Design a protein with these regions (language model features):
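Conserved, structured core segments of small domains
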Residues: 1-117
Length: 117
């Protein structure tokens, strides 16, 4: 089964983090991402580069920035292959021990194809 680890960052923490500490964290993250059960990963640009699209009252609306105003923002995701949730939790736990994120949300990936009506 596949699990998506949604990585949430705190921009204030990242801005204050010393460069040497960030390098240490990045090296640890890289080791985790190189494992055979990590099927893929993506980093996202900062929230200032985001645009939110909504549909309200028959109109498409665009706004700058994230959907929710929060200090934590979605910074990327890791796709993990595991027999069960415990395997995904173990990888998320390792990333948290590195202090790689403010929070990591784990979600099972739907393996079904989208079927049109």
């Amino acid at each position: 089964m596949r699990y998506a680890l949604l990585i949430y960052n705190d921009s204030e923490v990242l801005e204050r983090r010393p460069e040497e500490e960030q390098r240490r964290i990045n090296n640890g993250i890289y080791e985790v991402l190189e494992r055979p059960n990590v099927a893929g990963w993506l980093r996202l640009r900062n929230v200032e580069a985001s645009t939110t699209v909504r549909y309200e009252q028959g109109r498409t609306l665009l706004t700058d920035g994230p959907f929710i105003d929060s200090k934590d923002y979605l910074g990327g995701f890791v796709l993990v292959e595991s027999d069960n949730l415990d395997g995904a939790i173990a990888i998320a736990g390792e990333l948290q021990e590195l202090r790689a994120a403010a929070a990591i949300e784990i979600r099972p990936v739907l393996e079904e194809n989208l079927v049109a009506a």
